Amino acid sequence: MTPMPRFAILRHETPPGSPRPLHWDLLLEDAGTLLTWALAESPAAGRPIAADALANHRTAYLDYEGPVSGNRGSVTRWDAGTFQWRRRSDREIAVILRGDVLCGEAVLTRADDTTPRWQFVVRPEA
């Protein structure tokens, strides 16, 4: 049986003067890499959050806490667990999260295929 894919949300503190301020990195395991978005705010169920698509990250970040290379700050785990794919297209990704903090359907949507800007929302379980 194939294990459930893993996810993590890392609180990413950046150094002063960094082009991207404090944010939360959403990491979804996919075929040996991590699909990654920078969330503008701390995730909270039911609240839409701006999310910028980033380059895929190494799977080591699922378990990593500490300094980020290149003087890019440091990360601490905010949440982690497993997830199940629900829907996946160029404009929408929906997963069921089973984390220590977040449980429910998480949906990433974007207006068109040309922008890296997405919107992230978690719909809590009833």
Task: Label the predicted regions.
Residues 1-126:
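A charge-rich, low-complexity, intrinsically flexible signal that marks solvent-exposed coils, linkers
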